[in-house]
Amino acid sequence: MANTMRIGTHGRSLARASIPSVARIHALMRIEGLVPVVDSSLAAQMAMAGVPVEPGTEVVDNPALAGIDLFFSLGGDGTILDTVAKTGQSGIPVLGINLGRLGFLSSTREEGALAAIQAVKEGRYTIQERSLIALQGTDLANGETLIGL
């Protein structure tokens, strides 16, 4: 029997109205036999919005280190960049699900989440390699690192 795919999910500073969408995407993953693995910061956002993480969804501090097969970045293009920063050099593929208005990097809309989940489950996807640049400097606030694709 094949191993169950573990799909990491990450979102940053999501609008309260988007939180139920995250729960629906997790439910679709579970229905399709995948294991959603949610970043603890996203789980905290869900709890603050009164949307609990359902049984069958794992909560971890760093999904990139939790045996993840693929990441779903839930939000917009900024969230994809944040997700890529979290995955680092792991090589874990990232798929953006756009929960906002406009997305160039996260072009899959919430309405397409089920089709995306089924495609991932069935291996019907291709990985596009992207270059990643990082900017570090002494003038950046709090010593942060800026990244871009």
Language-model regions: role of each:
Residues 54-68:
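Short acidic low-complexity segments
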Residues 33-42:
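Short internal beta-strands
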Residues 90-108:
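Short, acidic/small-residue loops that bind anionic groups at enzyme active sites
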Residues 102-149:
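Catalytic core of DAGKc-family lipid kinases
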Residues 17-18, 43-49:
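Short, charged/polar "capping" segments at the starts of alpha-helices
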Residues 18-19, 78-84:
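Short glycine/serine/threonine-rich phosphate/pyrophosphate-binding segments
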Residues 1-14:
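Generic N-terminal amphipathic, Lys/Arg-enriched alpha-helix
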